[in-house]
Curated annotation (Swiss-Prot):
Temperature dependence (free text): Optimum temperature is 30-42 degrees Celsius. Partially active up to 65 degrees Celsius.
Protein name listed in UniProt: DNA topoisomerase 1
Family: Belongs to the type IA topoisomerase family.
InterPro entries in alphabetical order: Topo_IA, Topo_IA_2, Topo_IA_AS, Topo_IA_cen, Topo_IA_cen_sub1, Topo_IA_cen_sub2, Topo_IA_cen_sub3, Topo_IA_core_domain
Residues covered by the Topo IA-type catalytic domain: 154-611
Cofactor (UniProt): Mg(2+)
Gene from which this protein is expressed: topA
Matching PROSITE patterns: TOPO_IA_1, TOPO_IA_2, TOPRIM
């Protein structure tokens, strides 16, 4: 709880309770309000729809709609429950309400914030006047103005949020079970996440279908000093453009199948012809045939809104969208920037003045645009248009002034926002572009024309403060790039000083990055800027997408899920339909559409919407129920990738234990019949890397592995295999014999359980070993692990040397220490091991505790390194002070620093572990000028 210590922001001795979302925000605001204000935080949402069946109160468990948490038979009335971890917060807030005269709900001013305010109102049931306090930056003037000018709760915004919440619940809870039954457990479908996954899968399909084409070109280094000794620069490069009047083909002249789009219009050079031209032109005298000079002007970029901030932070700072929003949240709550969830590029008059003043002070009058620049955009589905994201206050603090107050990430993002805002009020960049055409003859008689293009910036204008980055996978040229050419005139002679022939391959379309995916979603009108970060995180957490560098790569599971949805629920992942649904949801918020009618049509069907809409197809419920039995799980999980050289289809099958290759081949034991041939697929193999040649290699790898010989001690065969997680060796155990009358051997396992029996020993190959060359001796060493080094005489505990997933280590009881090399596993002595244990425990790669499953970056709160460890109840993240279990959907190998720090922050916010909460009680909520909802 925070109380103000400044002069009163209100009148008289009226006591006011101000509720915000976060403790940080509460502390900051309390400092700006008077002693008559008590500021407390709700720590986010205090209630929501049930998360699972256990959350549903007993009185509703028998209801047919209970699993949804929405009474679809009673106007789609939501069932709200107070989160168990928030009950103490609610009790505390109710206690504070007893000692105040007014309640100010000061949550964020968007849909989500308005909904939090409404839920607080419904849960706390205050008996004092209630006002809505709204601000978009946490500065003293803004907070005082908001306190002095409160408004009423905006029920239209609450309705907008609640409708989306209900829609997403219906979509997810009806469609996700289809994926569980037909693809794999723990998968999920969502209104936006499924479309985002489809966009990424579609791009990978394009890459897989792509056929590369080869072409050659000729580059000349031309010397202008032969005719003008003062030419600057004297030498420049030019590309061969035409040969005997025919344009030389470039990559853009080929289609995705590697064929020319207009074969009659271009000339494709091969290595021989390009080389001959280069040789024939070396030393040739050429002349300028045309000079075209144009003025160049570039206007500044608009200030940031949520989506453009995420895109630019990804390109320039390499931040994920989740990381960007987390940092921006901290900057906002500490009063450094305005609210970071906005789709507006507008600046207030005071912000424009602040930006212009700072640009004038830092760069000079000539760098400031003559008049204030205002950036407006027509946003079809804009929500609560605030200001753009900018530095807070009427006078901006420069990054240098905040250097000591911000951590590294905060400083970098603030600097980006500050630069973009100041640059938006600066003058245009100006310069000239120059295009030259240079012609001549090759020694073999061909008439050739070279092109050269240049750009010179004569006045940088806003580029002095800020240059936007380009997407690294898409390519392109930045706005401040210059390419200078000499000032030549038509007819002027130039010599070909050097020529080179270069070969090229056309490239498949680039994979999406977080930045380009956000841009694509925005252009399609799908989702909202405030949700893009969580959507990208969700599709990675669910295993649909993984990052390879900055590229988003779909998994084979994503292919199966998208294929199922396209084939059986096509409208749900149709881009235009999803965008149109956003329009309709906004019409509800604007009062142009009745919420209950719209939800009824969507779920149960009706005449609502265009031909082919979900409503006209009978509604979501019928669509799911009617299609479920008709979905062939094997067909859905079979992705045809290509035909082999004999015309046999090759499929990737998505199995319960991962994807694998399969094709049908002749069965030598049964002439005239066929049998499946299978091959493992490695986890790190991306879909577009699977070629017919690689498939043949994988099929040729024996499933039973490469036999290394017989273990002389056991008589078991030892084989080397290549598995999903890399190469390993294992022993082949004999088939169990049938049991005797006593049933002690060969007893069949109970239904649903795997047969019991000895498991084969296995061992991963060292990094220094190769699957093709590993020997029986190597394998037996690996299978002998862990190796007993000796017994510690002080503790009487056994010390072993082992090979873990993340490297070699020693283990003594629960105390483990990393080893420097794999060879030490077999060579380290007891004395050497004891010396290692005699050293103090260290973090990181020399950690003294059990070797971590994975090492991460530093936690932004504690500043200490985070690691993933394997605990009694499963993997957890720790910074040495706070432990937080990984949750459903979190994966040790793919969890990000942002997600790990989020888990730690959530664990800190929940405080010490509490005893099990009592059973939830449900009660009807009182209407507040909107449709009623159940709550508990």
């Amino acid at each position: 709880m925070a109380g103000g210590d400044r002069g009163s922001g209100g009148t008289g001795n009226v006591r006011r309770l101000v509720i915000v979302e976060s403790p940080t925000k509460a502390r900051k605001i309390a400092g700006y309000l008077g002693s008559n204000y008590v500021v407390e935080s709700s720590r986010g949402h205090i209630r929501d729809l049930p998360r699972n069946a256990a959350d549903v109160p007993a009185k509703f468990k028998s209801e047919p709609w209970a699993r949804l948490g929405v009474n679809v038979d009673q106007n789609f009335e939501p069932l709200y429950i107070v989160s168990p971890e928030k009950k103490s917060t609610v009790t505390e807030l109710k206690g504070l309400l007893k000692d105040v005269d007014e309640l100010y709900l000061a949550t964020d001013g968007d849909r989500e914030g308005e909904a939090i305010a409404w839920h607080l109102l419904e849960t706390l049931k205050p008996r004092v006047p209630v006002k809505r306090m709204v601000f978009h930056e946490i500065t003293e003037p803004a907070i005082r103005n908001a306190a002095e000018n409160p408004r009423d709760l905006d029920i239209a915004l609450v309705d907008a949020q609640e409708t989306r919440r209900i829609l997403d619940r219906l979509y997810g809870y009806e469609v996700s079970p289809v994926l569980w039954k037909k693809v794999a457990p723990k998968l999920s479908a969502g209104r936006v996440q499924s479309v985002a996954t489809r966009i990424i899968v579609q791009r990978e399909r394009e890459r897989m279908a792509f056929h590369s084409a080869s072409y050659w070109d000729v580059t000349a280094e031309l010397d202008a000093s032969v005719s003008d000794p003062s030419a600057s620069p004297p030498k420049f490069t030019a590309k061969l453009n035409t040969v005997d009047g025919r344009r030389v083909a470039t990559g853009r002249d080929f289609d995705s199948l590697g064929q020319l789009k207009r074969p009659d219009e271009v000339l494709v050079l091969d290595e021989a012809s390009a080389g001959a031209l280069a040789s024939g032109l070396r030393g040739a005298q050429l002349a300028v045939t045309s000079v075209e000079q144009k003025p160049y002007t570039r206007r500044p970029y608009a200030p940031f809104m949520t989506s453009t901030l995420q895109q630019e932070a990804a390109r320039k700072l390499r931040f994920s969208s989740e990381r960007t929003m987390s940092i921006a949240q901290r900057l906002y709550e500490n009063g450094y920037i305005t609210y970071m969830r906005t789709d507006s590029t507008t600046l207030s008059e005071s912000a424009i003045n602040a930006a212009r003043t700072q640009a004038r002070q830092l760069y000079g009058e000539e760098y400031v645009h003559p008049s204030p620049r205002q950036y407006t955009r027509k946003v079809k589905n804009a929500q609560e248009a605030h200001e753009a994201i900018r530095p807070a206050g009427d006078v901006f603090q420069t990054p240098g002034q905040l250097h000591s107050a911000l951590d590294t990430d905060e400083f970098r993002l603030y600097e980006l926002i500050w630069q973009r805002t100041v640059a938006s009020q600066m003058a245009d960049a100006r310069g000239t572009t120059l295009s030259l055409r240079i012609g001549g003859s090759a020694s073999s008689g061909e008439q050739v024309v070279f092109n050269a293009s240049g750009r010179t910036i004569t006045f940088p204008g806003f580029l002095k403060a800020y240059v936007e980055s380009i997407d690294e996978l898409a390519g392109g040229e930045s706005d401040d790039a210059e390419s200078r050419l000499p000032n030549l005139t038509q007819g002027q002679r130039v010599d070909a000083a050097d020529l080179s022939a270069d070969g090229h391959q056309t490239s498949p379309p680039a994979r999406y990055t977080e930045a380009s995916l956000i841009k694509a979603l925005e252009e399609l009108g799908i989702g909202r800027p405030s949700t893009y970060s969580s959507i990208i995180k969700t599709i990675q957490d669910r295993g649909y997408v993984q990052k390879k560098g900055s590229a988003l790569v779909p998994s084979w599971v994503a292919f199966a899920v998208v294929g199922l949805l396209e084939q059986h629920f096509g409208r749900l992942v149709d881009y235009d339909f999803t965008a149109a649904m956003e329009d309709e949801l906004d019409e509800i918020a604007n009062g142009q559409e009745q919420r209950t009618n719209w939800l009824n049509n969507f779920y149960f069907g009706g005449e609502h919407g265009v031909e082919g809409s979900i409503a006209r197809a009978g509604g979501l419920k019928q669509l799911v129920g009617g299609n479920l039995e008709g979905i062939d799980a094997r067909e859905v999980n079979s992705i045809k990738v290509f035909d082999d050289s004999e015309g046999r289809p090759v499929y990737v099958r998505v199995g319960r234990n991962g994807p694998y290759l399969e094709r049908m081949v002749d069965d030598p034991d049964n002439p005239g019949e066929q049998k499946p041939q299978r091959a493992n697929l490695k986890e790190d193999l991306t879909p577009d890397e699977l070629t017919p040649e690689l498939a043949e290699k994988l099929f040729a790898t024996p499933q039973e592995g490469r036999s290394l010989g017989i273990d002389p001690e056991t008589g078991h065969e030892i084989v080397a295999k290549d598995g999903r997680f890399g190469p390993y060796v294992t022993e082949v155990l004999p088939e169990p014999e049938d049991g005797g009358d006593d049933g002690t051997a060969g007893t069949p396992a109970k239904k649903g359980k795997k047969p019991t029996g000895p498991k084969p020993r296995t061992g991963s190959l060292f990094r220094s070993m190769d699957l093709e060359t590993v020997t029986l001796e190597d394998a037996l060493k690996l299978l002998s692990l862990p190796r007993v080094v000796g017994v510690d005489p002080t503790t009487n505990e056994e010390i072993t040397a082992q090979n873990g997933r993340y490297g070699p280590y020693l283990k003594r009881g629960t105390d483990s220490r990393s080893l420097a090399t794999e060879d030490q596993i077999f060579t380290i002595t007891l004395d050497e091991a004891l010396k290692i244990y005699a050293e103090p425990k260290r973090r990181g790669r020399q950690a003294a505790s059990a070797p971590p499953l994975r090492e991460l970056g530093n936690d932004p709160v504690s500043g200490k390194p985070m690691v993933i460890k394997d605990g009694r109840f499963g993997p957890y993240v720790t910074d040495g002070e706070t432990n937080a279990s990984l949750r459903k959907g979190d994966d040790v190998l793919t969890i990000t620093d942002e997600r790990a720090s989020e888990l730690l922050a959530d664990r800190r916010a929940r405080g010490p572990v509490k005893k099990k909460a009592p059973a939830k009680k449900a009660a009807k909520k009182a209407p507040a000028k909107k449709a009623a909802a159940k709550k508990a």
